[in-house]
Amino acid sequence: MSKKHYADRNLKFETLQLHVGQEQADPVTDARAVPIYLTSSYVFHNCQHAADRFGLKDAGNIYGRLTNPTEDIFEQRIAALEGGVAALAVGSGAAALTYAFQAIAHAGDHIVAAKNIYGGTYNLLAHTLPDYGIEATFVDPFNYEEIEAAIKDNTKAIEIETLGNPNSEVVDIEKIAGIAHKHGIPLIVDNTFATPYLVRPIEHGADIVVHSATKFIGGHGTTIGGVIIDSGKFDWTQSSKWPWLVEPNVSYHGVSFAKDCAPAAFATYIRAILLRDTGATISPVHAFIFLQGLETLSLRVERHVENALKVVKYLENQPQVEKVNHPSISKDPEQQALYKKYFPNGGGSIFTFEIKGGAEKAQEFIDNLELFSLLANVADVKSLAIHPASTTHSECNEAELLDQGIKPNTIRLSIGTENIDDIIEDLAEAFKAIE
């Protein structure tokens, strides 16, 4: 019997997160670990070789702002884990979202976005991108008639998050993808809170997936980065909405990204144009750290979820708690069904609860936590807590906060991987301190 080739094996997630991009030892040094390539630029073999690289005829390295071998392995690996054809790593999650929007919409265009998204993304769409002529309409992601009614002739995409921020509502990716595709526009999904280990949005109809790699991918609160994954499934030539992707690009000798770079047209356009010209480049050191994070992603996420579900049960029975916002205990039949469909192995280690007593009591509770750290990050192996109304969503007015499900007494928790008894004891001590 002939030996089955490595690339032909149906490898599982836990194996892919360790091997994709470097299936064999480094060909130059025989190192098994991915090397960190700290170089600003790359030597061309001759002038023709250089010209071919710059003309996109040869897909090799040109300059460190655009590509790097360490980054390339990270991009290959996260693309494989998400089920995409290509990925682009950038300097932050905010940069990933900004590039995704700027590659899909220009001045005079429009984006429909769920209103239960990260405060920074809300601010980008509501206040920053309008300065560049890109408008946004925020919708209830569970009101499908409202979503469809918000789509206009100049709408270029719908954007949602797999799990809402900060209350972890589960959205129906397939349903919203169907609405987007009915109108000939792509669906962008921020999968930061779920990770591809729990949910792979592309399998449910998403066209573009983005992550703040700072969160679960890195996992240890050490490194800033973001990533865009191109599903390769959206047909950019189906209409005249994206001429910059379809028509010959004068800055690349007439290359048509949709025709010459398919199926990875979207990711290639961002790298070749936006990254080239605005340079939100990820450091190869950061890419290396994210690769190390991916190697333990499944193990960490399992523990995060296990601990979170136990904390949810504890908070449900805590008399000082008014309400716990977590899909696993939702009384809404739609949420129950969506959680079962998209999160069969559980999910939502970042969630909120409402404490009795208002904003002052919420802040007093947080100030009495010791094991939990008060900081703006989430998805660290260490447990974290924050008061969203005065921090992550502070740019929103009172009406906007309530519209996003954030009250003055809302506390967001990001449950880490510590021993669950220690996590619950810390919460119990904080409740006791504010009695």
Protein language model regions, located:
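PLP-dependent enzyme catalytic core of the Aspartate aminotransferase-like
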Residues: 1-4, 85, 126, 135, ...
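N-terminal "arm"/small-domain region of PLP-dependent enzymes with the aminotransferase-like
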Residues: 2-68, 76-77, 411
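Conserved PLP-enzyme active-site core in the AAT-like
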Residues: 2-9, 21-25, 87-317, 325
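Short, acidic Gly/Pro/Ser/Thr-rich loop/turn segments
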Residues: 25, 43-47, 235-236, 297, ...
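Conserved N-terminal alpha-helix of the aminotransferase class I/II PLP-enzyme fold
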Residues: 46-98, 120-128
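Short amphipathic alpha-helical segments
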Residues: 59, 85, 286, 290, ...
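Conserved C-terminal alpha-helix-loop-beta "cap" of PLP-dependent enzymes
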Residues: 301, 309, 315-411, 415
